[in-house]
Amino acid sequence: MAREKFERNKPHVNIGTIGHVDHGKTTLTAAITNVLAKKGQAQAQDYGDIDGAPEERERGITINTAHVEYETEGRHYAHVDCPGHADYVKNMITGAAQMDGAILVCAATDGPMAQTKEHILLAKQVGVPALVVALNKCDMVDDEEIIELVEMEIRELLDSYDFPGDDIPIVQVSGLKALEGDSTWESKIEELMKAVDASIPEPEREVDKPFLMAVEDVFSITGRGTVATGRIERGKVKVGEEVEIVGIRDTRLTTVTGVEMFRKLLDEGMAGDNVGLLLRGVQKEDIERGMVLVKKGSITPHTQFEGEVYVLKKEEGGRHTPFFAGYRPQFYIRTTDVTGQITAFTSDDGSNVEMVMPGDRIKMTGELICPVAIEQGMRFAIREGGRTIGAGVVSKIIK
């Protein structure tokens, strides 16, 4: 019997559960898999399967994350759930689990709490485009008015972080009751998934975006010219197309005269391919690791930006001592280290701090010594002597 082929007949969307500790994120995740499993759209998982999330390493940082997958009528979902609050912070900042949307879990018994706010803020800053609210533990609240008050409070909170509070669906659920097989609450899980299908937009495919490839290596082929190799991050590139070389030095235009993959010639390379691009009129000295090849006119290099950063603890291999404004580390951006300076910072809630301790989360302003292709929403690492001491995401380009 031939093996079954993975059918990519449904659009794929990445989501996750976020929210305050003990509001029921993991129980809800388990409930979703159990309810959908009854329709043959998931493998049922219990709380323990998800809660015992294995450790993963992303950019030198250890993160616990559980991954589950399931389907609805119209989509295939990959869903991430993190056991600890610190794991969420690291996960969202490193982009270890890219989210196209999230289910914000808030217990009706408590209403929004500190981490509810922090996760909404994080979602905004790292560019999670859409949220759906699961108002959990509704089986424990008899008074409909209390539920209405909590809903109003959540909507105001979402508004205050620039999410469309009035339009975001809030679905009353009970993860626990649904897990226990109570049909009333099982149908609420189905209602939640319909809201997710409808309100979380399908992400634009990487292949449809303008071409970009970060240069990993460069070599010359006698008689043919210079080849730049790397993985195409987005878009596609055809033989004969003009591309720009951006970053580190002045931007220059060249033409792609050949695309190779695994020593075979291609007409075009596309997102996800590891390719070598033969470039017309470019000397080996003109191009280096850390530059990017891009669709003409699609991107400009920058030196100043704002970022959200998680600074590693000593136990995670980070610094043992604090640092101050004016600190000069390396910023590892795409494929290379660029020296820069952290010119200013505040703590993540905007309050002023004199120094940054290992384990802190900060908003920072950075300035690089040479212009590089940085973009809003892009991830970077902060390194010192080749070891990672922080991870960040670009929240704003200054210049």
Curated annotation (Swiss-Prot):
| UniProt binding sites for GTP | 19-26, 81-85, 136-139
Does Magnesium count among this protein's keywords?
Answer: yes
Could you say which residues bind Mg(2+) here? 26
Gene3D superfamilies listed in its UniProt record = P-loop containing nucleotide triphosphate hydrolases (3.40.50.300), Translation factors (2.40.30.10)
Region: G2, residue numbers: 60-64
**Which molecular function terms from Gene Ontology are attached?**
GTP binding; GTPase activity; translation elongation factor activity
Which region ranges are annotated with the description G1? Answer: 19-26
Give the record's keywords alphabetically.
Cytoplasm, Elongation factor, GTP-binding, Hydrolase, Magnesium, Metal-binding, Nucleotide-binding, Protein biosynthesis
Q: Where is this region: G3?
A: 81-84
Which reaction is recorded as catalysed by this protein?
Answer: GTP + H2O = GDP + phosphate + H(+)
Compartment(s): Cytoplasm
Primary subcellular site in the record, as a coarse category: cytoplasm
Any one GO cellular component localisation term in the record: cytosol
The segment annotated G5 runs over 174-176
Q: What is its EC number?
A: 3.6.5.3
**Could you tell me which residue ranges the tr-type G domain spans?**
10-204
Q: Which NCBIfam families match?
A: EF-Tu, PRK00049.1, PRK12735.1, PRK12736.1, small_GTP
Oligomer and partners: Monomer.
Function recorded in the entry: GTP hydrolase that promotes the GTP-dependent binding of aminoacyl-tRNA to the A-site of ribosomes during protein biosynthesis.
Q: So what family is this one in?
A: Belongs to the TRAFAC class translation factor GTPase superfamily. Classic translation factor GTPase family. EF-Tu/EF-1A subfamily.
- PANTHER family associated with the record: ELONGATION FACTOR TU, MITOCHONDRIAL, ELONGATION FACTOR TU-RELATED
Protein's name according to its UniProt entry: Elongation factor Tu
